[in-house]
UniProtKB/Swiss-Prot annotation:
It is found in: Cytoplasm. It comes from Listeria monocytogenes serovar 1/2a (strain ATCC BAA-679 / EGD-e). One of its GO terms (molecular function) is pantetheine-phosphate adenylyltransferase activity. It catalyses: (R)-4'-phosphopantetheine + ATP + H(+) = 3'-dephospho-CoA + diphosphate. It comes from the Bacteria. Its EC number is 2.7.7.3. Homohexamer. This is Phosphopantetheine adenylyltransferase. The gene is coaD.
Amino acid sequence: MGDKIAVIPGTFDPITNGHLDIIERAAKIFDVLYVSVLNNSSKKPLFTIEERMEMIRQVTAHLPNVQVESASGLTVDYAATRGATAIVRGLRAVSDFEYEMQIASMNRTLNADIETFFVMTNTKYSFLSSSMVKEVAQYQGDISELVPEIVNKAVQAKFK
C-alpha cells in the first residue's frame, strides 16, 4: 500500500512543547511526517522561516521520519505534492475546533483524497501558544517549561 504520509502545517514562531508533543505523536502514526513551516502574512514573525526550520530540525532530530520544509500557498496543495493523504492539526480547546473544522471542510472540497486528522493536545499544553510564549518572554518571564531548551535560548536572545 505504500507509506502513510502526512503534513503538519504551522507558523511555529516559535515551536512550543505543545507543537512538539503533537509532532511526536503524529510521527508514531505516519511513516513520513512533513512539518511545513508557513509564513502568516497577518503576523510579523519573531524568527525567519529559516530560523524556525532549523529549530524544528534540532528538536525533532530524534524522529527519523520527520522532514522539515517551508511551504506557501494552500496546505492541501502542498500536501498533494508530497504524496500525503493526511493533514494533522492539533486542537487545544473547543474554541480551536470551529475554526479548524471550517479549514478541514474547505480542504476536503479542494481535494477529497486528503483527510484532516485532529489531535487533542496534552492537557498540560492546552493553554500554550507561540503568541503567549513571545508575550511572556518579551517581559522577561520564564518560558523554560513552555519550549524546548534551544528555543528558549533563541527566544531570550531576541528579547535582550
